[in-house]
Amino acid sequence: MRKITIAMLVSHQSNVLTRISGMFARRCFNIETIAAGQAEDKSVNRITITLYGDDHVRDQVIKQLEKLHDVYEVREMLPED
């Protein structure tokens, strides 16, 4: 297992973080750290989540996050980012 860092841009709406954390809970993915804040565009928030897993876990997390309505962009942050 390795450390995976996922960065996303989401709608600046109530309950977006709740839906994201609920997806992690339903899939039994454990969030190690989470940070959220307003992006340059005030209608968008930036959320960064770290977790531990393999490539399959990473792929599943990204696919599930991309299905959420208020999630605009999802990507893995690599060490060189």
Question: What does each model-found stretch correspond to?
Answer:
Residues 1-81:
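A conserved regulatory-domain signal marking ACT and ACT-like small-molecule sensing domains
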